[in-house]
C-alpha cells in the first residue's frame, strides 16, 4: 500500500488491515513527513495510534508520533497536531516518562485552546488528569476531568466526554468512594455503548469488577470479569490483567493457592509488556499483593 492508501484506509475507520502491518504503517507516516506533508503525517498518526497501544508497542508508537510531530510545518496543522501530541503523551505515560507526558499534554492544551479545538482541549485535560492520578492528586484528577466534561458538553461532543468521564471515575475510586465510582463507571459504560466504542467496554468491565470486589459483591465482580474476558485478544494490557482479576476473585473466596498461582501468571504477563501500570491498576496490585503476603505470614 502507498502512504496515500494507508491514509484513505484510516479515514474510512477500517484499521484492522493496518493493524496487521504496523511497521509499514509507521513507514507511511515517515514517508509523508519526509516529503514535507505534515498534515497527512499527523492525520495518519492521529487516526491510527491505538494500533500500537493495543499491542503494547510503546517505542514503535512513540517513534511514529515523533516522526509526524517533527515534520516540517507540523506546528501549523490544526486538529491533527493536538491529537498526535495527546497520543504521544499517552505513550510517554505508559512508558513511565512523566515529564514528556506532561509536556506533550500541556502543549496540546495550549494549541487546542489557540485553535478553538474542543476535542483537543478535552483530550489534553484528560492527559493531565491521568498524570495527576499517578501523582496521587485525586482531587486535581476530578477537577481536570470535570473541566473536560463541561467543555465537551458545551461543544455538544459526546465522544470528547468519554475519556474524562473514565478519569473522573478513577479519581473517585482511588479516594475510596466505591459506590460513587460504580455509578460513574456505569455512566461511562453506557456512554461508550451509545457511541459504539466497543474497544473501551472491556476496560470499564474490568474496573467495575474491581469496584464490586471492594464493595464485597463477589458474584457481581465475577460477572464483570467474565464479560471482560469475552473481548480477549483486543488489548495486550487488558489481557495480561485477566489472571490478576481472577486471582482477586479467588482470594475473596479464600482460595489462596489458586489466587497465588493466577497472580504470578498475571504479573509475569504484565512485566513482559514493560508498561508502567495505570495508577488505579497499581493500587489494586498493591492491595492484592498485600492480601496474598498476609496469608503467607
Per-segment meaning from a language model:
Residues 2-75, 80-85:
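Short, well-ordered secondary-structure microsegments
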Residues 8-10, 42-55, 82-96, 120-137, ...:
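Tandem amphipathic alpha-helical repeat scaffolds
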Residues 14, 18-21, 33-34, 54, ...:
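Alpha-helix C-terminal capping/termination sites
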Residues 29-30, 69-70, 106-117, 146-157, ...:
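Amphipathic alpha-helical segments of tetratricopeptide repeats
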Residues 150-164, 170-176, 180, 190-192:
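Solenoidal tandem-repeat scaffolds enriched in leucines and small polar residues
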Residues 256-297:
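C-terminal non-catalytic interaction modules
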Amino acid at each position: 500500500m502507498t502512504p496515500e492508501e494507508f491514509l484513505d484506509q484510516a479515514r474510512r475507520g477500517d484499521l484492522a488491515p493496518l493493524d496487521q502491518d504496523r511497521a509499514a504503517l509507521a513507514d507511511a507516516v515517515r514517508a509523508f513527513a519526509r516529503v514535507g506533508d505534515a498534515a497527512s503525517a499527523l492525520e495518519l498518526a492521529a487516526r491510527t495510534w491505538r494500533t500500537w497501544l493495543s499491542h503494547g508497542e510503546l517505542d514503535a508508537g512513540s517513534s511514529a508520533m515523533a516522526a509526524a510531530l517533527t515534520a516540517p510545518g507540523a506546528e501549523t496543522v490544526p486538529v491533527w497536531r493536538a491529537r498526535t501530541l495527546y497520543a504521544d503523551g499517552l505513550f510517554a505515560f505508559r512508558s513511565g516518562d512523566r515529564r514528556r507526558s506532561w509536556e506533550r499534554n500541556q502543549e496540546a492544551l495550549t494549541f487546542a485552546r489557540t485553535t478553538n479545538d474542543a476535542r483537543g482541549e478535552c483530550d489534553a485535560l484528560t492527559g493531565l488528569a491521568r498524570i495527576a492520578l499517578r501523582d496521587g492528586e485525586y482531587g486535581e484528577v476530578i477537577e481536570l476531568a470535570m473541566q473536560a466534561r463541561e467543555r465537551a458538553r458545551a461543544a455538544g461532543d459526546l465522544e470528547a466526554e468519554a475519556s474524562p468521564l473514565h478519569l473522573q471515575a478513577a479519581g473517585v475510586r482511588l479516594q475510596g468512594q466505591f459506590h460513587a465510582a460504580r455509578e460513574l463507571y456505569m455512566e461511562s459504560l453506557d456512554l461508550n455503548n451509545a457511541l459504539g466504542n466497543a474497544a473501551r467496554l472491556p476496560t470499564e468491565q474490568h474496573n467495575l469488577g474491581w469496584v464490586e470486589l471492594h464493595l464485597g459483591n463477589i458474584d457481581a465482580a465475577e460477572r464483570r470479569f467474565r464479560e471482560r474476558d469475552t473481548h480477549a485478544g483486543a488489548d495486550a494490557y487488558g489481557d495480561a490483567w485477566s489472571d490478576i482479576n481472577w486471582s482477586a476473585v479467588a482470594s475473596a473466596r479464600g482460595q489462596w493457592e489458586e489466587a497465588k498461582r493466577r497472580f504470578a501468571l498475571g504479573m509475569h504477563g504484565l512485566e513482559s509488556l514493560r508498561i508502567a501500570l495505570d495508577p488505579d491498576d497499581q493500587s489494586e496490585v498493591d492491595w492484592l499483593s498485600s492480601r496474598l503476603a498476609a496469608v503467607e505470614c
